[in-house]
């Protein structure tokens, strides 16, 4: 079974080819760098900084503790320029590499699916060739989604009904490498019955996909309700 969680464009396919060509250690370095840049704390710091020298930690294939904590301060750090030299590809390919990593991580962060299914999608749909690289992405994804799933399973969410929904529009700079490129982001602001604020940030395609998913869910609910109504009024049930 394939799910519609990501669209692979020609540019994305070219970026994936670059990913496949990277040595494993370089791959994990770029993976964790991109992940750190997408985290709220780093993004906030980047917005107030005029320098490009953002650091990233490296990891090795053998050191499992590093992969569990990719931002460990005991590991060597690289600036963006040093990372570009480490990757060793032309600048345009390096920019495409960062954007492809960012695209993949952003898309998998918006879906909660079985790890085995995501593993198959990374292998078959994205055509990642190295199983170790696929496993590294999976471990990072599991580490990020586990707290979310634990929170959803906690008792305090059982009656946590959404009572209010609002929205606003933000503009963000897409990367350090292309300061002039800005992306409009829709922010859905929801308030629960217990007073908790939930903010979800999405691009226009992601917002459209969310809308289509809601439409699909509503269609299935309507169909189930129609079947239930038909069954209740059938001659055999009277």
From Swiss-Prot:
Entry similarity comment: Belongs to the COMM domain-containing protein 10 family.
Function: Scaffold protein in the commander complex that is essential for endosomal recycling of transmembrane cargos; the commander complex is composed of the CCC subcomplex and the retriever subcomplex. May modulate activity of cullin-RING E3 ubiquitin ligase (CRL) complexes. May down-regulate activation of NF-kappa-B. May have an accessory function in the survival motor neuron (SMN) complex. Required for neuromuscular function and organismal viability.
Deletion phenotype: RNAi-mediated knockdown is adult lethal. Conditional RNAi-mediated knockdown in muscle cells is also adult lethal; adults show severe mobility defects, reduced flight capacity and don't survive beyond day 5 post eclosion. Conditional RNAi-mediated knockdown in neurons or specifically in motor neurons reduces adult viability.
Residue numbers spanned by region Disordered: 43-78
Record-linked Pfam families: COMM_domain
GO terms, biological process: motor behavior
Note: 'Valette' is named after a Grand Master of the Order of Malta and distinguished warrior, Jean Parisot de Valette.
Residue stretches of biased makeup (Low complexity): 43-77
Disulfide bonding pattern of the chain: none
PROSITE patterns: COMM
Protein name per UniProt: COMM domain-containing protein 10 homolog Vlet
Residue span(s) of domain COMM: 161-225
Origin: domain of life: Eukaryota
Quaternary structure and interacting proteins, as annotated: Component of the commander complex consisting of the CCC subcomplex and the retriever subcomplex. Component of the CCC subcomplex. Interacts with Smn; along with Sbat and Hez may form an accessory subcomplex involved in SMN complex function.
């Amino acid at each position: 079974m394939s799910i519609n969680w990501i669209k692979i464009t020609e540019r994305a396919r070219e970026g994936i080819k670059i990913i496949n060509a990277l040595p494993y250690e370089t791959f994990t370095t770029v993976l964790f760098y991109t992940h750190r840049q997408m985290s709220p704390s780093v993004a906030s710091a980047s917005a107030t900084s005029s320098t490009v020298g953002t650091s990233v930690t490296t990891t090795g294939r053998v050191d499992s503790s590093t992969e569990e904590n990719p931002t460990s301060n005991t590991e060597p750090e690289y600036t963006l320029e040093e990372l570009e030299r480490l990757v060793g590809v032309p600048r345009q390919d390096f920019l495409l590499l960062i954007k492809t990593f960012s695209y993949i991580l952003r898309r998998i962060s918006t879906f909660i699916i079985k790890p085995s299914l995501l593993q198959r999608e990374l292998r078959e749909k994205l055509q990642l060739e190295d199983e170790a690289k696929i496993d590294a992405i999976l471990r990072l994804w599991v580490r990020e989604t586990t707290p979310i799933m634990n929170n959803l399973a906690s008792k305090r969410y059982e009656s946590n009904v959404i009572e209010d929904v609002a929205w606003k529009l933000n503009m963000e700079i897409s990367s350090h490498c292309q300061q002039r490129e800005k992306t409009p982001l829709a922010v859905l602001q929801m308030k629960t019955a217990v007073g908790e604020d939930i903010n979800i940030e999405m691009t226009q395609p992601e917002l459209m996909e969310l809308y289509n998913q809601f439409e699909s869910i509503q269609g299935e609910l309507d169909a189930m309700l129609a079947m239930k109504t038909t069954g209740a009024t059938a001659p055999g049930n009277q």
